[in-house]
Amino acid sequence: MLRSRNRALSLGRQSQGRLDVPLMLITAALTVIGLIAVANATIDPYAVSEGTGIFSVLSRLTSNSFYWQLAWVGVGLVAIVLIQIFDYRVYGELAVYIFGVALALLVLVLFQTAGRGNVTAWFSWMGGSRSFQPSEVCKIAIILTLAKHISRYDGPIVKLKQFLPVLVHFAIPFGLVLAQDDVGTALVFLAIFLGMLFVSGLGWKIIAGLGITGATACVVIWPFLSEFRQDRVLNFLNPSRDTSGTGYQVRYSKIAVGSGQLTGKGLFQEGAISQLDFVPEKHTDFIFSVTAESVGFVGCLLIIVLYLALVLRLFYLSYKMQDRFGALIIAGVASMFLFHIFENIGMTIGLMPVTGIPLPFMSYGGSNMLANLAAVGLVLNVVRHQQKTVL
């Protein structure tokens, strides 16, 4: 074990290439757009402005959300730099300890008395005015440790004795997140797991078993879901079922998106439906709706193109990796982003059930911003330490 760790530590001095510029540019663009979106969602367009330009916007903000988001971007950038200190294979050697810390955080948060609704997924600080969601950063830990576990197998996972330990590895943190009643984040964990399995390769018997088990689990779990969770699924299947109750969010979200039309009503402008607080959680879960109303179809198309470029770039990098461990890390990050993007945008326009997961780089939330930037930092580390140049 000591010899393997010394070997991993020496890797940091070998085959260090350049950071992936396309990935960095895409991430930077989405982060800047996200900061603008948070400011747009938290402004009072009717307030008297002080100054001109950006100072006019800042003087009309209704909360400190923009400043906190900016601060978390700074923390995330520091995380990217710190992640580059060691070769990613060093982190792989520490996978057992990283997994242990992640599980400890997921267990400790269950004992928090304060939560949001029935969800106990946050550590509160600063007298409860600020919070931190450990499951967000635990996504990175799960990606790293699962990649290390799966990479021990030279080829596709075709035997049950190979698959079961990997399944248990995933099931423990997945179950702890479900115990927090955070179904959205649990589904992200599931997407990461399935994405990494797909890239690693699976035998057809295991694929069939997963399909049957998944379908059976949905039937078995349904009666045990809270009425609120069931309503969200039923409202998705029948949008007109309860438009003034649990379907209220999606109803006004779709109205806001549609009212943006081709070019939008403009950023920081009066007369927006979302600015009148008809859209709940407008700077977090439903920030895409607010942004769509402001920038219209054209602006939304640009944002979606950037997200598509992000995911495609990640899967391309995963494909080009010579190292199986590195390829699986990038595949896990790509799967995480893909599910977040598809689910969040889908729920704002009624194509997916509402789960409450944020839109990467855009939704307000420090824990998620830190996790997103740390994930990008990990990918940059993998690419930088590959001997073969990735175009």
Describe these PLM feature segments.
Residues 70-79, 293-312:
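Hydrophobic alpha-helical transmembrane segments
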Residues 186-197, 212-215, 308, 376-377:
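Hydrophobic transmembrane alpha-helices of multi-pass, membrane-embedded glycosylation machinery
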Residues 2-30, 36-181, 345-360, 364, ...:
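Membrane-helix boundary/helix-loop-helix interface segments in multi-pass membrane proteins
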Residues 256, 313-320:
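Small-residue-rich helix-loop
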Residues 317-355:
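Loop-to-helix entry and N-terminal half of a specific, functionally important transmembrane alpha helix
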Residues 41, 167-196, 226-230, 292-299:
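Helix-loop-helix junctions and helix-breaking kinks within/between transmembrane helices
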Residues 116-131, 208-302, 322-326:
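Hydrophobic, glycine- and aromatic-enriched re-entrant/interface helices and adjoining loop segments
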